[in-house]
C-alpha cells in the first residue's frame, strides 16, 4: 500500500537576507513524504524567490497532482519544474535506498569580511581551509580590499567568491585591482563576475582569477566545455532538477576536469542534510557550499549536526495531502 503526504512550511529568516535586491523575510516550502510497505522517503520542494522560474504555488499544484497519482498506484513522470523534480526524486531515492546515508557536513563558511570571525570558524575545520564571500553587494573596491585582507591574514585560505553577475567589466577590474596578484591563485574561483559569459571570460584572461559557472548552467545555450580560466561549476539541485540530472551535470563537469560544487538554495535543515548526502556521493573530493542554515530561525524535521537552532517537528507543519 502506498501513502503520500504533502506538507507546507514557513520559517522566519535572518533580517539581513537580501536576494536580488529583495529582502527575504521568510523561507517557504513544501515536503513530500512517500511510504510504501515498511519504507519511507522525504523530499523538499522550496523554489527560491528571484532564482527559481517557478513560484511556490505552481510547485504546490504540480506536487499535489504527482503525489495523488503516485498514491493511487501510477508511476507518473517527474514534473518539469526543477524544485519539484528534485524534491520528488530525493523522496524516491530515499524510499528505494538509492540515496546513500553517508553525508558531507563540511561547509565552506560564509564570511562577512571579518578575519577574526573567520579565524574562529576555520580553526575547527579539518583539512583544507575554504570559505565563501559574497561580492557585488557593495562597492567593487571594498570587495577587493576585503578579499585581499582575508587572503593576507590567513595564508592557507582558499576563497570562493560569488558575484551573481553583479559587475560590469569596469567594476570587475576595480575589484581585481585591489587583490594582490600574488594572492589571486588562492581564489579557488569567482562565480559569474559579469553579466555575460563573454565578459566573465575576458575578466579571467586579464586578471588570472579563475571563474566558475552557476547561473549559466540553467540557460538553454549552455554547454559543458573545458576552457581557459574556467575551474568549476556550481550546481544548485533545487534550481537544476532531478537527482538524475544533477548526476549528469556532475559527470559532465568531471569528464572535463572541472570541479563540481553541490550548493544550497537556502533549503531547510531537511533539504540541507539531503544535499550533504548528494555531495558525499557525487562530489566526495569537494567541500559543498551548504553554509546557509544560520540564515534561518529554526530547523525542520531533521537536524543538521551541531546546529543549536530549535527543531520544528512534523506535527507543526501544515498538511495539504
Curated annotation (Swiss-Prot):
Disulfide bonds: none annotated. Its cofactor is a divalent metal cation. It is an enzyme of class 4 (lyase). One of its GO terms (biological process) is menaquinone biosynthetic process. Mg(2+) binds at residues 162, 191, 214. Its EC number is 4.2.1.113. The active site is at residues 134, 236. The keyword Membrane does not apply. Belongs to the mandelate racemase/muconate lactonizing enzyme family. MenC type 1 subfamily. Converts 2-succinyl-6-hydroxy-2,4-cyclohexadiene-1-carboxylate (SHCHC) to 2-succinylbenzoate (OSB). This is o-succinylbenzoate synthase. The lineage of its organism: Bacteria, Pseudomonadati, Pseudomonadota, Gammaproteobacteria, Enterobacterales. The gene is menC.
Amino acid at each position: 500500500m502506498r501513502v503520500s503526504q504533502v506538507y507546507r512550511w514557513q520559517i522566519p529568516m535572518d533580517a539581513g537576507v537580501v536576494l536580488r535586491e529583495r529582502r527575504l523575510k521568510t523561507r517557504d516550502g513544501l515536503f513530500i513524504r512517500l511510504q510504501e510497505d515498511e519504507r519511507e522517503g522525504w523530499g523538499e520542494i522550496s523554489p527560491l524567490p528571484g532564482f527559481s522560474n517557478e513560484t511556490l504555488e505552481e510547485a504546490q499544484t504540480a506536487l499535489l497532482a504527482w503525489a495523488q497519482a503516485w498514491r493511487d498506484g501510477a508511476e507518473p513522470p517527474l514534473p518539469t519544474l526543477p524544485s519539484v523534480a528534485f524534491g520528488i526524486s530525493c523522496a524516491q531515492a530515499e524510499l528505494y535506498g538509492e540515496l546513500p546515508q553517508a553525508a558531507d557536513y563540511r561547509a565552506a563558511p560564509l564570511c562577512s569580511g571579518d578575519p577574526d570571525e573567520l579565524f574562529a570558524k576555520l580553526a575547527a575545520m579539518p583539512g583544507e581551509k575554504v570559505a565563501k564571500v559574497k561580492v557585488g553587494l557593495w562597492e567593487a573596491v571594498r570587495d577587493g580590499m576585503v578579499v585581499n585582507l582575508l587572503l593576507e591574514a590567513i595564508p592557507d585560505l582558499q576563497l570562493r567568491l560569488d558575484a551573481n553577475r553583479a559587475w560590469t567589466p569596469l567594476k570587475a577590474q576595480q575589484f581585481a585591482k585591489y587583490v594582490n596578484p600574488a594572492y589571486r591563485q588562492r581564489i579557488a574561483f569567482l562565480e559569474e563576475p559579469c553579466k555575460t559569459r563573454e565578459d566573465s571570460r575576458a575578466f579571467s584572461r586579464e586578471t588570472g582569477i579563475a571563474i566558475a559557472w552557476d547561473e549559466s548552467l540553467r540557460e538553454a545555450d549552455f554547454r559543458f566545455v573545458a576552457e581557459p580560466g574556467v575551474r568549476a561549476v556550481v550546481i544548485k539541485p533545487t534550481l537544476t532538477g532531478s537527482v538524475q540530472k544533477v548526476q549528469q551535470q556532475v559527470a559532465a563537469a568531471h569528464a572535463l576536469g572541472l570541479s563540481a560544487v553541490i550548493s544550497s538554495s537556502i533549503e531547510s535543515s531537511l533539504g540541507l542534510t539531503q544535499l550533504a548526502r548528494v555531495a558525499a556521493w557525487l562530489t566526495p573530493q569537494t567541500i559543498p557550499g551548504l553554509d546557509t542554515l544560520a540564515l534561518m530561525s529554526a530547523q525542520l524535521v531533521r537536524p543538521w549536526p551541531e546546529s543549536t537552532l530549535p527543531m520544528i517537528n512534523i506535527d507543526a507543519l501544515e498538511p495539504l495531502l
